[in-house]
Amino acid sequence: MSTNPNAGIQPLTNSISQSASAHPELYHTTSHESVSTYQLQSQLSHSATSNLSTAANFHTRPPIANDENAQNLSTVNSSHSSELSKANLVDVEKCIQDPLLQIFPTVEDPDRFVFSIDPKSPLIAVNWPFRKKLKITCVYSYVALCSTFASSVFSVPAEAITTIFHISLTVSLLTMTVFLCGYIAGPIVWAPLSELSGRKLPLLIGMFGFGIFNISVAVAKDIQTIMMCRFFSGFFASAPLTVVAAAFADMYSNKHRGTAITIFAALVFDGPLVSPIIGGFLTKSYLGWRWTEYITSFMGFFALVIVYLFCDETYSKAIIRNKAKEYRAMSGNYFVHAKSEEEVLTVPDVAKNYLLVPMKLLFTEPIVFLITLYSSFVYAILYLLLEAYPIIFSEKRHFSMGVAELPYIGLLVGVFIGSAINISFEPWYYRRCLALGGKPDPEARLPPMMIGCFMFPAGIFWLSWSGYYSYVHWIVPTLSGLATGCGILLIFLQCLNYLIDAYLFRAASAVAANTIMRSAMAAGFPLFAVQMFHNMGVGWAGSLLGFIAVALIPMPFAFFFFGRKIREKSKMAVVL
């Protein structure tokens, strides 16, 4: 009795025919080709050469058995007319002559079975319609705003809990410090997770944990619980700060990426300035200080919902992995896989890439150290001002809680002015890059910073001495925020851009070093702010900070004129 060697694959071809009929957009066929086929690029030791068309794709490989009948089975490159590269066609029914191969398929070089997507495919985030990009940009910007909103929302209730829990003011200010310490620890987890699973999952996990731990703070019965939950709230809140900028880089080309990142940075700085205003009025009202955390948790859960419902994955490697998984399940061929699925990230890799290498860059590269020092200083001053403003407007001018925080609006407006200035420079920077053949020009990032380096100390001196004299009208120190906020935004943002362009292939490590130092300084500055402004006086305490800012003015000019020469002598910087 004879047997049909192709009988074993007939159900599979029938299944693919049904899938192709149900999902024609996933398959590419011509008028004379059957849809019950795979589009494969394959070569067998046997002489099987008939044509069929397919679209199949898959990911992990099962254990491979040795079989001499299939040692020359080679690559599968699935293809779709808009998604996949074209491949030669081979008759699937003649690919498997031995029934054992249906159970234990053998391949000589499984690494050649790589699934890929055309870079111009509409699946890739950079090719999405502008309306879709704008929607995701708004959602992710809101998520980042939630994160930084929580960092300082407890600055006003900190004074109230000193009486409730019988602690000193310095201890109560630790609630902001431990939150910012969570910013230091979080990126060590979220950055590698975003590389492995994409941008969306870290945001979902982050906002869920963020909401849970903010509720925990709201219902806490002792200061120890508040401190612990504030740390973990900061840990989960660091997810959007780690991931959102990368998601914008996924979606936008060089021409528009700078504008998107500027908007993101503005909202990151606006969060700590808006929350004390809301926190002040909530604490003063019948709702009490606990509602500052309830409101924050509700914001986090709302962010979780809208990210889940309205945001697609932007990371190209994750998109390819997901498509490979779909095609693998549809076709049953477990050889084909996405290249990124071969990557294995171990704990030593995480320690090296996100701790050791950043620290090495920080202490061996002058550019990284100086730029990080400057950006960390202005970032820390932002959180220090959260303690200085209540002294100026509440203690010296006797503004009530809530009203005393309204002068932060001056800083808010200043941040938006800085954003507008930065966006106005983007076309000029883009033309500079085009003149270099599309290569980044780090020094071209610095002109906005040259403006900010003067506005920043000017705003600090303005605030210090107009705030020192209580008879000066309150609008005068409030308007100082226009210069201070503008300077902070311009300096901080261009410092990050300069690091990314100067250390192109090590940009993640350079930014990680910047994140660690700036979060550490921001965590420490509020702890001595009150004592410094009380003991030295508002005028001289602010002047001390202003003199430090003046000493840093030459930095952007030095890097603008000599940055390329410094990079040429560096072992890690990029010179294109």
Curated annotation (Swiss-Prot):
Membrane topology classification: Multi-pass membrane protein
Protein name, entry field: Uncharacterized transporter C569.05c
Cellular localization per UniProt: Endoplasmic reticulum; Golgi apparatus; Membrane
Record-annotated membrane-spanning stretches: 149-169, 173-193, 200-220, 231-251, 261-281, 291-311, 366-386, 401-421, 446-466, 472-492, 503-525, 542-562
GO biological process assignments: spermidine transmembrane transport; spermine transmembrane transport; transmembrane transport
Pfam families: MFS_1
Record-stated family: Belongs to the major facilitator superfamily. CAR1 family.
Annotated CDD domains: MFS_Tpo1_MDR_like
Organism for this UniProt entry: Schizosaccharomyces pombe (strain 972 / ATCC 24843) (Fission yeast)
Keywords tagged on the record: Endoplasmic reticulum, Golgi apparatus, Membrane, Transmembrane, Transmembrane helix, Transport
Keyword Amino-acid biosynthesis: no
Segments of skewed composition (Polar residues): 1-21, 28-40
Molecular function terms from GO: spermidine transmembrane transporter activity; spermine transmembrane transporter activity; transmembrane transporter activity
Region: Disordered, residue numbers: 1-40
GO cellular component: endoplasmic reticulum; Golgi apparatus; plasma membrane
